[in-house]
Amino acid sequence: MFFKGEGKNSRLYAIIALIVVIIIVFTFLFSNQLTKAYIPDKVLSFWTEDIEERSGSDTLFGLEKWASFTYRNNNETYPAYVTVTSIKALFMPSEADLLDKTIEALDKAKEDGIILDESSILRGKRKNNFNHESMFVIYTGNDTSKDPVEKIKIIGETWNCVVSGSSVICIGFAQITDNLHGNSEPNLIHWEKIVGSKTGFLGFISDNGLIYNVKCH
């Protein structure tokens, strides 16, 4: 009789443990909602979101999620864009790991003819308009897909948002020459819009810098 009672207790404990696990999983799933980072309309000016570039996905049964928005300046002579990607993973990566992933993504741009000048690399940290400390990497390079080749500048900037529990990766790209029409002097007006901040990041003072104002919570 003793052993029979012990067997019943074991089964009861197993059922209770299973119920607890199910509750924990469902609690995590419902709390694992992705807060999608975006650029507020009030700072976009003549920039607009490219709806066709909007993307996102769930992986690992919804335990990892991501969403991405792309904004363009709608200028054919000096094209520029900013992509804002939000990631909610089972475990939040470090900022250093995020930056490494971003550098890998920038390096893959060579498949589209974007050749980065490795000697031009600039790394650092700054605080955005919502007081998140970000890490960034900046390159100058060439867009060899254009004829003639055009000069470009590109930034990858990342941070973790503790409030929303998500990670944010921003990539900003700007063509700064117009060799097609004989304008080889750098035109940084769209680059300034991408990287500008109240504190004068890279010498560009602006309340409406796009990456500086990305809202993630």
PLM region spans:
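Solvent-exposed, well-ordered amphipathic alpha-helical segments
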Residues: 1-12, 165-169, 209, 215
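Surface-exposed amphipathic alpha-helical segments
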Residues: 47, 169-217
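Conserved polar/disulfide-associated segments of primarily extracytoplasmic proteins
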Residues: 53-167, 176-179
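Short extracytoplasmic/periplasmic juxtamembrane "stem" segments immediately C-terminal to an N-terminal membrane anchor
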Residues: 39-56
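Intrinsic disorder/low-complexity segments enriched in polar/charged and small flexible residues
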Residues: 49, 68, 161, 190-193
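Secretory targeting signatures
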Residues: 1-39
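Short, flexible coil/linker elements and helix-boundary hinge sites characteristic
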Residues: 1-4, 30, 75, 110-114, ...
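Extracytoplasmic/secreted envelope proteins and their assembly/folding machinery
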Residues: 40, 103-106, 207-211
